[in-house]
């Protein structure tokens, strides 16, 4: 199966893209933004954590197949976990640095209003549309991850059903072999019974044939 067709690889790819987006956002914004943006980032990080749990579960299912090599998949999930831990550390540090900065309330409101006005004048009002576009793209990626995880769940269920069917097939084969062995044993006992029943009669026939042969030989000897 190609990576483009593998649901596992698709989830890994989407998850890495989400982490890269958050990393780029944190890199561009050294300080914490408004509450909505920070909450959105926290939600994405939680979604990534849940995705990692689902990936670990899918690896456990794949390990049941002895022919499946999951070492590469385990390395990919480990790399994602490391990226997530690093981003969470950077995110928490930004929050702490933001809360430690004490600015009078009036000055904060005044500066915020001034900065907002300047940003609107310099950027031509593109800040909010850019944020909305980023959020829409994140929603699309999350929907893709959700659908891919559903496919992984369906595949895991299918593999479980196949293993269960194979177990039932082996049980049926064992029962069939037991039936064949029992039939062979009954046939052997019947043959032994027939042999014992007719053994004396067969012995008498053999003795009679030997007597006839001896008489014929004696007659031929006298004639000669």
Curated annotation (Swiss-Prot):
Please tell me where this protein is predominantly located.
Golgi
Instruction: State the annotated membrane topology for this chain.
Output: Single-pass type IV membrane protein
Q: Which stretches are Cytoplasmic in the membrane topology?
A: 1-203
Lipidation feature positions (S-palmitoyl cysteine): 205-206
Query: Residue span of the signal peptide, if any?
Result: none
Keywords from the named record:
Coiled coil, Endosome, Golgi apparatus, Isopeptide bond, Lipoprotein, Membrane, Palmitate, Phosphoprotein, Protein transport, Transmembrane, Transmembrane helix, Transport, Ubl conjugation
Q: By its UniProt entry, which InterPro entries does this protein fall under?
A: SNARE, Syntaxin, Syntaxin/epimorphin_CS, T_SNARE_dom, Tlg1p-like_N
Summarize the PTM comment: Phosphorylated at Thr-31 by TPK1 and dephosphorylated by SIT4.
In residue numbers, the region (Interaction with VPS51) covers 1-106
- Listed GO cellular component terms? cytosol; early endosome membrane; endomembrane system; endosome; endosome membrane; Golgi membrane; late endosome membrane; SNARE complex
What parts of the sequence cross the membrane?
Answer: 204-224
List the coiled-coil residues: 35-101
The UniProt GO MF terms for this protein read: SNAP receptor activity; SNARE binding
Q: Which Gene3D superfamilies match?
A: 1.20.5.110, 1.20.58.90
Q: Which PANTHER family match?
A: HL02043P (PTHR19957:SF224), SYNTAXIN (PTHR19957)
| Record text on subunit structure and interactions | Interacts in a SNARE-pin with the SNAREs TLG2 (Qa), VTI1 (Qb), and SNC1 or SNC2 (R). Interacts with VPS51 of the VFT (or GARP) complex.
Q: Which family does it belong to?
A: Belongs to the syntaxin family.
Q: Any idea what this protein is called?
A: t-SNARE affecting a late Golgi compartment protein 1
Organism the protein comes from: Saccharomyces cerevisiae (strain ATCC 204508 / S288c) (Baker's yeast)
The primary gene name is: TLG1
